[in-house]
Amino acid sequence: MEACNCFEPQWPADDLLMKYQYISDFFIAVAYFSIPLELIYFVKKSAVFPYKWVLVQFGAFIVLCGATHLINLWTFNLHTRTVEIVMTTAKLMTAAVSCVTALMLVHIIPDLLSVKTRELFLKNKAAELDREMGLIRTQEETGRHVRMLTHEIRSTLDRHTILKTTLVELGRTLGLEECALWMPTRTGLELQLSHTLRQQNPVGYTVPIHLPVLNQVFSSNRAIKISPNSPIARLRPLAGKYVPGEVVAVRVPLLHLSNFQINDWPELSTKRYAMMVLMLPSDSARQWHVHELELVEVVADQVAVALSHAAILEESMRARDLLMEQNVALDMARREAETAIRARNDFLAVMNHEMRTPMHAIIALSSLLQETDLTSEQRLMVETILKSSNLLATLINDVLDLSRLEDGSLQLDIATFNLHAVFRQVFNLIKPIASVKKLFITLNVSPDLPEYVIGDEKRLVQIMLNVVGNAVKFSKEGIISVTAFVAKSESVRDPRAPDFFPVSSDNQFYMRVQVKDSGSGINPQDMPKLFTKFAQSQPVATKNSGGSGLGLAISKRFVNLMDGHIWIDSEGPSKGCTVTFVVKLGIPEGSNEPKLPLMPKVSANNSQTDFPGLKVLLMDENGISRMVTKGLLMHLGCDVTSVSSSEECLRMVSQDHKVVFMDVRVPGLDGHELAVRIHEKFMKRHERPLIVALTSNADKVTKENCLRVGMEGVILKPVSVDKMRNVLSKLLEHRILFEA
């Protein structure tokens, strides 16, 4: 035990001092341990502190210092070597951390000294941001005022209201003493005071347009400060006021006003401007700010746009009023034209009936007289009467057809017919006339043409008769050739009509007919008027040629209705001409058989016993027409009973009558109603006579009405003996006849 050195010798200690050191070290340790906690809290909460790692070093230093003081509590009494080692280690660590922290502070202190400089920099930045925010707020305020002013300006399209609203809103927004608008005069040489803020009816002051201040303002799109003593700034008297307010002026473009004939604005051929003048309150230190000038400039542009819109509105309203007036006038003209067309149609209908009735008598009696024994001189006179009457009847038909073509009421009568028979019919009609003039006429119908086609047989015959008839009429000698074939696309082109390009299909084709003669020919300058109604070329319109000038005009319209084209070629006078027309025809479905019977051949028998004992009832209100028709029927051997009214016809008709001829235009009970009554009287078909309308109306409506009431046929006056003979033959053979 004596050799044991477990306890090192210690200094004797004062108990009171020891107690105070104990307490002091304890509280020092508590303080050292609490400060790192506070630093940790600061590091977590501070997002912008740049030296967090320095705070960590401070924390470690303080913790080690606290640990040193805490360990030191055990060194006041006797303690072991272990406590001494721990104490020494703690002090070494504290010394190391303290030195590192001290070295780091050498580098940090300059940065900490620059914090003040940064603070000043940040303050300057903050002040600059405040100024920018103030500018932004000013711009927003200006924008709000602009939007408000724009809304007020555009709330109306009346230009006087626009200008007055602009001045009022600018005066209220900017606190103006006066605001005025100068407009150019009609001559454009002066500006006139048109609107002011304070004066209800401003006197029309004017200033010359060539003033330097005006040129200065007009040459810039910005608001310009001008002298309060300028002529355009003297808006109000300055009595009792010492310092006039600042004045600015800005131009207002008059956009596109040259396109609008505003009554009280000048007609501006070049770009001109109005001028807006704004005055701040007098006797005040207020000045114009930049944002206020920008506001004025924007408002001036908005006023220009609003005035342009107002001008457009005024022009559109004027155009609308003018259009309404024109529509009223056009509607009145249309009604007058419709009235005139109806009057013309009524006149033509009446004249058609009134002319055909005597023509019927002339042609019928002439044809009857022609079949009697006459001397050669008498026969020549009768033939002349008959030819002249037929020519007059043709002229009547042409006039009526042209009238219906022009008002669009004429429509094609589409049916299946024998195309080859049509060519033979035309050839047989024209050949005798050509023989008299010693003309040789040839007909060449291509085998590729279908025998039966779908189209308007009557109009096709009329076209061919007009074209071939003209060739015969205007040729004194030579040959006339008629050629017909299926048209190919390359053979129907006419350089004068490049838009006409026909295309055939499986059930339709185009037929080309070419009529070439060696007649008088045509002057090239007369070509354009050949298809004009009542017009003929000079070499053609000879005194012996005859004709009304309607044939080609009507033929052209018929060809157009058939989706075709017609043209004429001639090398000049005395060199003949070639007329070519192309029409579209349909191909019947199924077998190539006729859907309608062919025209029966004309009987060569001119005896009076063609229809011996055939009982016929004739009803015609016109006495002459009734007598003439009765004579025709009796000449053909018919047993005729004639009556003058529908009531008498209804009373006289019986089963013994085989045919009833009736005029459909009679007073009281007309022909259509009479046909219905006859159908009601004879319910059985074999007991009912055949009903045929004998009419002067050649329109399609008459035919449709007759079909509707059950008539078996329609015959157009005038009627000759041969025509009546053919009519009865076809009627009795087929029990139906509707003359084309």
Curated annotation (Swiss-Prot):
Keyword RNA-binding: no
Cofactor entry: Cu cation
Alphabetized Pfam families for the sequence: ETR1_N, GAF, HATPase_c, HisKA, Response_reg
PTM description: Activation probably requires a transfer of a phosphate group between a His in the transmitter domain and an Asp of the receiver domain.
Taxonomic superkingdom: Eukaryota
Subunit annotation: Homodimer; disulfide-linked.
Protein name, per record: Ethylene receptor 1
Source species of the chain: Pelargonium hortorum
Lineage of origin: Eukaryota, Viridiplantae, Streptophyta, Embryophyta, Tracheophyta
